[in-house]
Amino acid sequence: MNEIIRNTQSSVTNGSLDPQDWSEFRALAHRMLDETIDGIANIRSRPVWQPIPDGVRAALKSDVPRGASELAEVYREFAEHVAPYATGNVHPGFMGWVHGGGTAVGMLAEMLAAGLNANLGGRDHMPIEVERQIVGWMRSLFAFPDSASGIFVTGTSMANLMAVLVARTAALGTLARQHGIGNDGALLAAYTSRAAHGCVSRAMDIAGLGADALRKVDVDVDHRIDVAALRAQIAADREIGFKPFLVVASAGTVDIGAIDDLRAVAQLCREEGIWFHVDGAFGALAILSPELAPLLGGIELADSIALDFHKWGQVPYDAGFLLVRDGEQHRQAFAQPAAYLSREARGLAAGTVWPCDLGPDLSRGFRALKTWFTLKTFGTDRLGAVIARSCALAKYLEARILAEPRLELLAPVNLNIVCFRYRAGDAVNREVVADIQESGIAAPSSTTLDGKFAIRAAIANHRTEETDIDALVAAVLKFGAQRSGGVTEVEAPPLAAQ
């Protein structure tokens, strides 16, 4: 026995993964932090995005690293091969998708969370109280009752899926979790607009209800769900035996940022006894802006709301969130008894409702900390002003487009998304988008509206200024002229000074 103990002790000598020289580690850590801060502070000196050279991709590929490497060498690889070729959404010229720019504050909070290495699946510790505090703040902002529940998730795609599952359980009862959806589940029907994000259809698929069970309702002239058409579709489905159980309204559609008439949809859902969910991935946080909040009238009547703090909230990725009006219905959709998850009257396992009772994950990172730091450090008033500013910049871009005969506005500007094109064919505009991205000047994206290829600018970065909008317009005119055989140099109209 003693020999076994001695052999075991020998095998675990120096088994800790902590640094052998903390002073050396501290110096390198400070250098990493300083260089990361420098990268954010001097972001304008870099291209928004740049293509990844084949050599860089090849340099990252290697066999399984069975032996140790010096941390400094690993960091060198990161600094040379990873950091310069990121998505680019820290840069103020990034306007491709609704990606928040992050903040230095959020970066520090992420580091602190990693230092704690807390699992927020459950048990009794203060990191969970931080998450619960944010749930309380969201209840207050959206005028939800004290009994409402909330949980952090990866993003709104997951939050929408979870909302579908909560609504499904509310419609079929908890036995459906044990026995499956059965014949009753096969008759469930959900509704959203044709302009809704594709993740809603995907949620129906993953939930086992099928994408065909999602009725995509036409939009009106303002690109909002046609409430009259929605009412008619619900009536038609009931007539042939379907059970309408869910309506997903959009607070900021993916293509142009339109907000459905939430109050009218809420009223219809109340009359019909249907779960009313709002996909507010980015638009829901307009609640922080006094001038934009009225656009969300009716969101306070929702049964559930999905949103992303990593979009307009500027929290580093990822930080999605689901808020549910009826906390007990939320719990019934996910809670599962297990001996290893038993609750005790005292000790580390104390508590009643744990986050794992409100979602599918037992292993959960401390997403709430960077959100808590962001909300506490900047305050909701300042974040609301940033959100309003991004919408003002979108209107500025709209004015630039309307003042330039070579550009065409393709949709009304509702919030922070602008869809337009160079007055040429789709092929030219498709090349223009790629040209601009590869130039590093800006990073727009694209979509298709009414059969036309559109250049899509989604302004979500708190660092973006009018000069960045001017640079985008100038780039579109320059590359559009080159691709269409026109003039290559264009002086942009000086609307910024007006």
Where are these regions (language model features)?
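Active-site C-terminal subdomain of aminotransferase-like
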Residues: 253, 272, 297-402
